[in-house]
A protein has these predicted regions:
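Hydrophobic transmembrane alpha-helices of multi-pass small-molecule transporters
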Residues: 1-69, 183-196, 200-311, 315, ...
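Flexible loop linkers connecting adjacent transmembrane helices
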Residues: 4-9, 45-50, 75-91, 126-135, ...
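Early transmembrane hairpin of solute transport permeases
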Residues: 57-168, 362
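Hydrophobic alpha-helical transmembrane segments of multi-pass integral membrane proteins
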Residues: 90-123, 314-329, 340-379, 384
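Membrane-interface helix termini and inter-helical loops of multi-pass transporters
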Residues: 39-52, 167-178, 268-275, 328-341
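Alpha-helical transmembrane segments of multi-pass membrane proteins
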Residues: 95-109, 133-154, 174, 178-179, ...
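Membrane-core helix-loop-helix motifs of multi-pass transport proteins
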Residues: 123-215, 410-442
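Membrane-interfacial loop-to-helix junctions in multi-pass transporters
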Residues: 19, 55-61, 88-100, 131-139, ...
Length: 446
């Protein structure tokens, strides 16, 4: 039955959902019109808000582009190819492939969201190479489903923010340690339930072999070849210039790689196991340099990798423009206040979760959402005598929840997989529906 429902949503999404870039453009027009209708802003002001915010995510766009590029480079190195290949051997059937990829991606996203996005996609490619009969689209949707857990894990921006001295709501709610957020009973229940149930759900979404979505064989061969190509040891090249000798020098890679390792060690000594997107990119980059052996091999791999970052580079400014309109026009505040006004001490965390899920379509950034909703939800929680830590985590889970049907965060996986958003979103709708249940139970009854 589940596979039949998933098949229905898959057909609908593949027929009517536009490409991720067009989705961003459509959202732009929707927010533009809503801002004129529901606020006192004129069309000229909405244009100003849009243009003013358009370049506000440049740093983040570069970070996400690099996580695709550096992750690809690292995965194309001999050591990582062998490691992912060994893990992929745990799956011998399509069902095992779905279970393995979902579980590994979920664990990786709990550790760090950027790490999890890349590792899940790359493992899925290895598994698809080993089990060619698996539905490649469902496999990539399974890899993306692990991202649902990220805001309840160690890189969650909201719990880490409110645990940091000097955060913008410190005078209102104080400093909230992660023992009251990440390691609370409700968060452990939600994470544990999803960690167990998501692999099983994705396994149930498998369809009969005759109905498996067909993927262009050239696509899978192309993506797999980047990662699984035969390892060929280059013979000592007869180089005629000093520049060519430097390009093929292992010494250069070792020296710069050791410098990178020194900083990585320093970072963890100073900050503990604090992973953020910058240090993840740094680790991927310098291990990629070391594992490829020579600068020339590294650059050859980088040339292949950058081809996958184009969609991310183009789309992020449009989402920044959408965020600019939502925030500057007051639309985001209106949405949050509407949910606050219909809340009581029992329903506030749950309605905070719902409102965050809706807002996430237009402001797909956990930190950005907290900057908008924190100032509204936390005073409301204090006024209703509701746990502020739980209210904050409700916003965090709302952000994570609708990521399943918001193409923004799927871009890195889609770039690596060589797929379009419509290829996985039909399955992700089912994941969205199911995950609503354990998240709601955790926020209402724990």
């Amino acid at each position: 039955m589940l596979s039949s429902i998933a098949n229905f949503f898959d057909r609908m999404v593949r027929r009517y959902l536009p490409d991720a870039f067009l989705f961003a453009i459509i959202l732009t027009f929707i927010v533009f019109i809503l801002g004129i209708v529901f606020t006192d802003n004129s069309p000229v002001q909405m244009v100003e808000f849009w243009g003013g915010g358009f370049w506000n995510l440049l740093e983040f766009a570069m970070q996400m582009s690099l996580i695709v590029v550096t992750g690809y480079i690292l995965a194309n190195s001999p050591i990582v190819k062998r490691l992912l290949g060994k893990i992929s051997k745990l799956a011998n059937t399509p069902g095992q492939a779905i279970l393995l990829v979902t579980f590994v991606a979920s664990i990786a996203c709990l550790i760090n969201y950027g790490f999890g996005l890349v590792v899940g996609a790359l493992l899925a490619i290895h598994v698809a190479k080993r089990v060619p009969s698996v539905d490649y689209r469902l496999l990539m949707a399974s890899a993306y489903s692990g991202f649902l857990l990220w805001h309840g894990g160690f890189s969650g921006s909201i719990p880490l923010t409110i645990a940091t001295q000097g955060h913008f709501l410190e005078e209102t709610m104080g400093i909230i340690p992660v023992t009251e957020t990440l390691f609370s009973s409700y968060n452990l229940f939600i994470v544990g339930t999803l960690l167990i149930s998501l692999p099983l759900l994705n396994r149930l979404l498998m369809r009969p072999t005759r109905n498996v979505g067909e993927i262009d064989p050239e696509l899978l061969n192309l993506q797999a070849s980047v990662i699984e190509e035969e390892e060929v040891e280059e013979a000592e090249e007869k180089t005629s210039t000093p520049a060519e000798r430097l390009e093929n020098s292992r010494v250069i890679s070792i020296l710069i790689g050791l410098l990178g390792l020194a900083f990585i060690l320093y970072h963890f000594v100073q900050n503990g196991l604090n992973l953020n997107i910058n240090i993840v990119n740094f680790i991927f980059l310098f291990f990629g340099i070391l594992f490829h052996g020579t600068p020339r091999r590294f650059l050859n791999s980088a040339t292949d990798a950058v081809k996958n970052a184009g969609g991310i580079i183009v789309q992020f400014p449009f989402y920044a423009g959408i965020m600019g309109m939502m925030i500057s026009s007051g639309l985001s505040d209106q949405l949050s206040m509407w949910f606050v006004n219909i809340s009581n001490d029992f329903t506030l965390p749950w309605l905070s979760f719902i409102s965050a899920g809706i807002l996430n379509f237009f402001v797909p950034s956990g930190g950005g959402q907290w900057a908008i909703q924190g100032d509204i939800m936390i005073p409301a929680a204090i006024g209703l005598d509701v746990d502020t830590a739980k209210t904050a985590m409700a916003v965090a889970w709302g952000d994570a929840w609708t990521n399943m049907v918001q193409p923004f965060w799927a871009l890195p996986i889609l770039a690596i997989a060589g797929l379009k958003v419509r290829d996985i979103m039909g399955f992700c709708v089912m994941i969205l529906f199911w995950s609503f249940i354990p998240i709601s139970i955790g926020l209402l009854f724990f």
